[in-house]
């Protein structure tokens, strides 16, 4: 049986929710075009590259040297939402072809850090490396924005896009009008690959009140499959670097001072067993971030092609089994006729061998196992059926067509030319 590993986000108020398979609230505007008119995100992302070091200047560094090189690229995040405040970390990056005097930067963080929505405060280390907890911190390095299903171009911090499955979100940082010096991180040069046993270090904001903290360790395993609480099954770097609440979204660096991972989870039960989203692979933070940036438009947020979300929350209830708590308006489940208080007893789908499959479900855990299994191969446009009971002897079968999921979807899409 797989254990759920806790994501390392720090909360000042915690609300326990049942399993949620949904994104930001949806608003659809059919007259504004269709998501089908947008090019595939992987094609668009292939034209983007993040900044790397000059190969001639690249060299192995001591821990102190590497930390000094990158620590100002790691920011502290504070999200004030209805019901509380949460904290996390993020890493500043730039496109490879960004102008040296550019006032626009990107911040990569974890999706679960910003998924509660609300006001977001970004605290960038100031020109002297001081952080927001220091009394003499330069407040010019504090930037504010709002995360919801509207585009806020008047804010210094704006959402570019978020991807729940990859646990990556990208923010845009606009420093126009401020006399600040921003340091961005570099991703590894072409040809580099992380090795097991390699020395690494993390910079983040443990507890939400200790920004700029350096913690070192090694890569324990390259492609460790782990089930991350509130995210799902992921292929991650296993590291023994200490990752605690508030570190989520922070940077994992190699001894060249290159950003090789985004820290996202740790285990409260097993000391030294922690995780980071890799820079390599199909769902690497580089791949996901590039797709989010490439597909973002003036009217809607970025996305990763093929991702879908049912749009329901579920819970186990005594004597009732698996019950739908709520259905998101406009979601795939809503369009199929799923109702709050429906009892889900089964799910039907076509597997990757094109064979029909029907599975019974009786609890949130059994439903979750099937859900993450089919997430591996079903994509937007595919169909599944939920078998539900509404108190009668005969069950009902509701067919859902899976549609592209956009976190904080504004409902406005480009119109076909």
Q: Where are these predicted regions, by residue range?
A:
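Catalytic-histidine neighborhood of serine endopeptidases
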Residues: 95-165, 374
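Active-site substrate-binding loop(s) of clan PA
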Residues: 66, 96, 158-160, 177-209, ...
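PDZ domains, with a preference for the canonical peptide-binding region formed by the helix
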Residues: 279, 346-387, 393
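N-terminal activation segment of mature serine protease catalytic domains
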Residues: 27-100, 107-110, 118-119, 166-168, ...
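C-terminal cap/linker of serine protease catalytic domains
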Residues: 61-63, 259-320, 370-373, 383, ...
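Active-site region of chymotrypsin-like
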Residues: 73, 174-185, 213-276, 316-325
């Amino acid at each position: 049986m797989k254990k759920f590993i806790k994501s390392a986000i720090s909360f000042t108020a915690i609300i326990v929710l049942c399993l949620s398979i949904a994104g930001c609230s949806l608003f659809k505007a059919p007259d504004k075009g269709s998501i089908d008119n947008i090019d595939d995100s992987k094609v668009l992302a292939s034209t983007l590259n993040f900044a790397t070091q000059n190969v001639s200047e690249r060299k192995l560094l001591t821990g102190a040297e590497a930390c000094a090189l990158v620590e100002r690229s790691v920011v502290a995040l504070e999200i004030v939402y209805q019901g509380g405040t949460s904290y996390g970390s993020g890493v500043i990056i730039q496109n490879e072809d960004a102008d040296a005097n550019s006032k626009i930067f990107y911040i990569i963080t974890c999706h679960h850090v910003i998924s509660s929505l609300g006001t977001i405060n970004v605290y960038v280390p100031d020109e002297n490396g001081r952080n927001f907890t220091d009394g003499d911190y330069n407040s010019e390095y504090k930037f504010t924005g709002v995360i919801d299903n509207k585009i806020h171009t008047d804010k210094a911090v704006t959402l570019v896009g978020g991807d729940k499955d990859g646990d990556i979100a990208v923010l845009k940082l606009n420093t126009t009008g401020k006399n600040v010096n921003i340091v961005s991180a570099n991703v590894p040069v072409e040809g580099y690959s992380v090795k097991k046993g390699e020395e690494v270090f993390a910079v983040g904001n443990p507890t939400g009140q200790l920004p700029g903290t350096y913690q070192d360790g090694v890569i324990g395993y390259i492609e460790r499959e782990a089930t991350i609480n509130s995210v799902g099954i992921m292929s991650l770097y296993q590291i023994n670097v200490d990752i605690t609440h508030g570190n989520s979204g922070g940077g994992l660096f190699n001894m060249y001072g290159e950003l090789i991972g985004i820290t996202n989870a740790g285990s409260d039960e097993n000391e030294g067993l922690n995780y980071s989203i890799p820079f390599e692979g199909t769902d690497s933070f580089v791949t996901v971030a590039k797709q989010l940036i490439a597909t973002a438009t003036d009217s809607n947020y970025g996305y990763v092609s093929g991702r879908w979300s049912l749009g329901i929350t579920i819970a186990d209830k005594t004597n009732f089994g698996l019950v739908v708590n709520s259905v998101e308006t406009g979601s795939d489940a809503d369009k199929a006729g799923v109702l709050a208080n429906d009892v889900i007893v089964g799910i039907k789908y076509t597997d990757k061998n094109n064979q029909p499959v029907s599975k019974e479900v009786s609890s949130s855990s059994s439903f979750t196992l099937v859900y993450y299994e089919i997430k591996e191969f079903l994509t937007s446009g595919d169909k599944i059926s939920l078998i539900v009971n509404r108190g009668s002897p005969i069950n009902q079968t509701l067919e859902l067509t899976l549609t592209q999921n956009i976190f904080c979807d504004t409902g406005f899409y480009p119109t076909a030319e």
